[in-house]
Structures are given as C-alpha cells and as structure tokens.
C-alpha cells in the first residue's frame, strides 16, 4: 500500500485558531486543496460563517479564513490508507506532523478545533502529551466532521456546531 502525505499548514501569519483534520482525502490530495471533495461541507460552512461566496477561488477562500485568524492543517504528515475513510488509516503507518515547529511559529494559538473524532483521537494519541505545556492555555474542541462520510448529521446541525469558531 502506498504512503500518502498531507499538506503544509495554510498561512500562519496572525493565526490564533487551528482547524485540524486527520489526513486529506483522495479528492483533496488530487487537487492539492484542503476539503476539496464536492460533498464536503467545510467551505460551505466557512462561507456562511464569514460571509463570503463559496464559489470564489480556493486561494481567495484561504485568504478569507486567514483574515479571521484561522489556519488549516492535519494531524498526520504521512500514513497508509486505501480509501478516503479515516477508519481505513493503517495505525502502524501513522506519522504525525511536526507540531514543535508549528507551535513555535504560532505562539498566539488560542483554540484548536478538530474536524471530526478521528482528528481528535490522532492528536490525543500522537501529539498532545508531547506538547502539554504549550497547550495549557489552548482550548481544544471537537466539531462534527464536515466529510460526506459523516452524513448522519444534517448540514444545519453541523453549521450550528461550527458556529463555535466565531464565538
């Protein structure tokens, strides 16, 4: 099975909110864009929360959320996964991202939101203990996954939960 690699974090300039996924799905990896699957509601939610047109370019969407102090990244740097499903991540293949460099650059980080349960579990298992001292003043919160695989929760309920990032 081939090892897949995630992306670098988006702009960290002035960031105080980190939204963490687990590992980009196949559609995102192919397009080299966070949350690129057409049925992933992440960008639809961001557009509604921060009042921009969801159809603007990917680069413009990144600029809009960066202006709100938000940076996107994933817990994992590398892993093996035969599909886009988090449940298919081969545990023995997991390599977390380098959070030491990230936290050094983003000392003003105040909130970390996990886009789904798997991102939170991977962070807890592979990252949080190592960085306990950097995380003492950081709020950690899990939000419902925006992935189409988490279709049991409707859009309006997801949007309601995600409103927490603007509070």
Predicted regions: what is each one?
Residues 67-122:
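Internal catalytic-core helix/loop-beta-alpha segment
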Residues 28-90:
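Short, surface-exposed acidic-centric catalytic microdomains
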């Amino acid at each position: 099975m081939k090892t897949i690699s995630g992306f670098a974090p988006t702009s960290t300039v002035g960031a105080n909110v980190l939204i963490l996924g687990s590992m980009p799905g196949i559609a995102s990896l192919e397009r080299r864009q966070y949350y690129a699957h057409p049925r992933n509601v992440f960008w639809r939610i961001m557009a509604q929360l921060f009042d921009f047109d969801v159809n603007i370019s990917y680069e413009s969407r990144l600029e809009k959320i960066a202006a709100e102090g938000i940076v996107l990244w994933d817990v994992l740097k590398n892993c093996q996964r035969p599909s886009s499903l988090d449940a298919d991540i081969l545990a023995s293949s997991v390599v977390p991202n380098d959070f030491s460099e990230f936290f050094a650059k983003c000392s003003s980080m105040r909130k970390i939101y996990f886009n789904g349960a798997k991102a939170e579990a991977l962070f807890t298992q592979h990252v949080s203990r190592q960085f306990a001292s950097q995380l003492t003043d950081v709020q950690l919160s899990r939000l419902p996954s925006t992935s189409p695989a988490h279709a049991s929760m409707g859009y309006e309920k997801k949007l309601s939960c995600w409103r927490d990032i603007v509070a």
